[in-house]
Regions:
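Transmembrane-helix boundary motif in ABC transporter permease subunits
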Residues: 1-6, 189-220, 236, 291-297, ...
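Membrane-topology segments of multi-pass transport proteins
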Residues: 1-15, 34, 38-176
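Membrane-interfacial helix termini and adjacent extracytoplasmic/periplasmic loops
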Residues: 2-6, 230-274, 344-347
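Amphipathic cytosolic juxtamembrane alpha-helices at the membrane-cytosol interface
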Residues: 5-7, 210-212, 266-268, 295-325
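Interhelical loop and adjacent transmembrane-helix boundary motif
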Residues: 9, 46-51, 55, 342-387
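Transmembrane alpha-helices
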Residues: 20-22, 219, 275, 281-286, ...
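Transmembrane alpha-helix signature in integral membrane proteins
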Residues: 172-203, 316
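C-terminal transmembrane helix and the adjacent membrane-cytosol boundary/short C-terminal tail
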Residues: 286-297, 301, 369-398
Length: 398
């Protein structure tokens, strides 16, 4: 009897946690697993051109495929045209070999009415790109069900004809630049939030209760406003004929013909993101500062320390758990920020999250998933490094 009671006492807390486990599995683990699968698995071309892909598996890639391969792909192109799916295959292969999308539609319209004993010559006459090895290599690459091509493309690499991994052409190198820019923006926004947020948190923690509540309310107000509305409001403030420029011109700080460019660039991204993420530094820092006894500073002063020495040697070290919590939150959120750079960032202020959204909009789920995995792994590495240097157990959020 006692044993049964012991088992029940152990099962009861586990059963209470089951809804939470199910929620995490459905909303986090399953989407994460699907994202990992999408980044390495793509059967669209393989399912559309099964016979062609079977023949291309034995192709050496040195010379053009045989007449059998040409005839087989021509027959399958006709079927795709009848099913109205030829455009999808053209888009998919075009992601591997740019400039080949039109080949598929052009060939589909003309090859169905052709009866010939030499399909190689016929298809080359329809479009001479069928005589290029790059196109056939692209078809073979796009037809692989499992591959790392999305991860290679996500770091501006590609696989050469001989199988080696090389950098893509300079004009196509965009992702590594966006990674660096995203890290730069996340770092700058984190520092700006710290520089601006620490004094605000200090003021909230050390002012009379009435004023402290008003300041805290001002910090919390942005959470009650839509992120989209806040981002859009910055257009009114920062544009060349906006409030800030008009104010500076009215004070004759800048001439009317020398208005500042504060929107649709990196400056707009930094300003808007700092304002949006500032509460995530203020609140954890305030929670820690309010718990520091004021007697510590008085004791340091009584021992001969001036205000600066007392702050640096006594007050600042005790506030680090809150500072570290806020900075970590802001940095991680900055890496994945999307809507604000999209609205106020222009071309120069776009981050890697905007590229993920672009590939989702164009149905390039594999590349979007690969970039997302890279960003996720980067954040996990950051977390591990932070835990090693600072210690996550020392963080305080309340």
């Amino acid at each position: 009897m006692a044993a049964k009671q012991g088992i029940k006492s152990r099962i009861r807390p586990i059963s209470l946690a089951l809804p939470l486990v199910a929620f995490i599995a459905i909303t986090f683990l399953m989407p994460l697993g699907n994202m990992l699968k999408e980044s390495v698995y793509d059967a669209e071309v393989a399912d559309a051109l099964p016979n062609t892909m079977r023949l291309l598996n034995d192709w050496d890639g040195v010379e053009l495929p045989t007449e059998e391969v040409f005839r087989t792909i021509a027959e399958e192109i006709v079927v795709l045209q009848e099913n109205r799916t030829i455009g999808k295959i053209g888009i998919r292969v075009n992601r591997v070999v740019s400039g080949t999308r039109s080949v598929w539609g052009k060939t589909a319209r003309r090859v169905k009415d052709v009866e010939t004993d030499n399909m190689i010559t016929t298809m080359v006459e329809i479009d001479d790109r069928w005589s290029e090895l790059d196109l056939w290599q692209g078809i073979k690459t796009a037809g692989q069900r499992y591959s790392a091509k999305n991860y290679l493309q996500a770091v501006d690499l590609t696989r050469a004809d001989d199988g080696s991994i090389v950098s893509v052409d300079e004009q196509r190198r965009v992702y590594n630049t966006l990674y660096v820019r995203t890290l730069y923006v996340a770092t700058v926004v984190t520092l700006l939030c710290l520089v601006i947020g620490y004094p605000i948190a200090y003021a909230i923690a050390h002012t009379p209760p009435t004023l402290s509540k008003i300041l805290l309310l001002c910090v919390l107000v942005p959470f009650w406003t839509s992120l989209l509305a806040r981002a859009t409001s910055w257009i009114v403030l920062l544009q060349s004929q906006g409030v800030i420029n008009d104010f500076l011109v009215s004070l004759r700080i800048i001439p009317d013909d020398g208005r500042l460019s504060l929107i649709y660039n990196m400056t707009g991204t930094l300003i808007a993101m700092t304002q949006n993420l500032l509460p995530f530094v203020v609140l954890p820092t305030y929670a820690v500062l309010s718990s520091i006894p004021p007697t510590y500073m008085r004791a340091a002063a009584s021992l001969g320390a001036n205000p600066v020495q007392a702050f640096v040697r006594v007050y600042w070290p005790q506030s680090l758990p809150g500072v570290a919590s806020g900075c970590l939150l802001v940095f991680i959120l900055s890496i994945g920020f999307f809507i604000t750079p999209a609205i106020v960032g222009g071309t120069d202020g776009q981050l890697i999250s905007n590229m993920i959204a672009y590939h989702i909009d164009t149905n390039n789920w594999g590349l979007a998933a690969a970039i997302s995995v890279i960003v996720l792994v980067s954040v996990l590495i950051l977390y591990v490094v932070f835990d090693r240097w600072v210690g996550v157990d020392k963080l305080k959020l309340n």
